[in-house]
Amino acid sequence: MAKLTVKDVELKGKKVLVRVDFNVPLKDGVITNDNRITAALPTIKYILEQGGRAILFSHLGRVKEEADKEGKSLAPVAADLAAKLGQDVAFIAGATRGAELEAAINALEDGQVLLVENTRFEDVDGKKESKNDEELGKYWASLGDGIFVNDAFGTAHRSHASNVGISANVEKAVAGFLLENEIAYIQEAVETPERPFVAILGGSKVSDKIGVIENLLEKADKVLIGGGMTYTFYKAQGIEIGNSLVEEDKLDVAKTLLEKANGKLILPVDSKEANAFAGYTEVRDTDGEAVSEGFLGLDIGPKSIAKFDEALTGAKTVVWNGPMGVFENPDFQAGTIGVMDAIVKQPGVKSIIGGGDSAAAAINLGRADKFSWISTGGGASMELLEGKVLPGLAALTEK
């Protein structure tokens, strides 16, 4: 990566601004999954060990109006982070700017840390954070000593005041360890993969993945398709899909992708079908591709699992984004489990999960530790897989 990283700058005695991704799920004020906080620890600890004073920025959820602030404070995150670091984390509830926040920042000593309140509280007044308000970016930049560390891969595809805005107003904007690793794993897998390179794409909508499929058809040796979008590809070929999910307005796109694919695009050959999405009374495997009338496909079937297993044999690089079925339901997990197991059993494979539902599936189904890398950013990893330039990354200082 030709951008400066946190190891390229002198941190001792400096107020270092850090964009992290602490957008964690909360239930009744309790964090239900702290992976994103854990993922940011190496960068935060490094800054503190080097004698820097870390000033952390993060968003949490969506905030459009005053009422949305309820339950969106980063206070529980500050407490969790303090426990993980084993030291106090300064935090002023509700403060994204102002004299009290500035005083707390100026009171920091080397090796101490402060968390600024949810950056999206600034969205209540004209979406200042989300629209990268120039004045806000300048103000936040003024709170530090000219160094900004972006370690929030999850928002790297956004142009916000807390990433791009601060970057534009500091002397050096650098990548943290998490951002550096994310880019290294995903970009290298797509741009300079060890071959054979197999991409696996699931999820429900073709519309979400058109750019990704197009880019990966050029880069990968094989592209396997599963999940709900299977049925749009089926219908585009005149295959009966029963009541399965379909994007009627994307049938032509699916047809074009199949024509362009030169045999690289591999579709399932059977499905697990049910007579309803919820409250079903019958679940069965289809004989072939066609889904029965009155039924809908909710997972890939056993023949497809075997076919995908065969397609993955000998793969050296695998990028997976999107589950094969409705994995949250035990009746429709087999496809996702089968594909995960087929990936991780390949000797010497570099296996990457592109965030979002696939990451949740690997974690919930106990396979997370078997993968080389699990991305922390769904949308950002999708855009990297699409070959797009991420604004948060582009804004960093060149080496």
UniProtKB/Swiss-Prot annotation:
Domain of life, per lineage: Bacteria
Subcellular location: Cytoplasm
Main EC class the enzyme belongs to: transferase
InterPro entries xrefs: Phosphoglycerate_kinase, Phosphoglycerate_kinase_CS, Phosphoglycerate_kinase_N, Phosphoglycerate_kinase_sf
UniProt KW DNA damage keyword: no
Keywords: ATP-binding, Cytoplasm, Glycolysis, Kinase, Nucleotide-binding, Transferase
Name of protein: Phosphoglycerate kinase
Source organism (scientific name): Streptococcus suis (strain 05ZYH33)
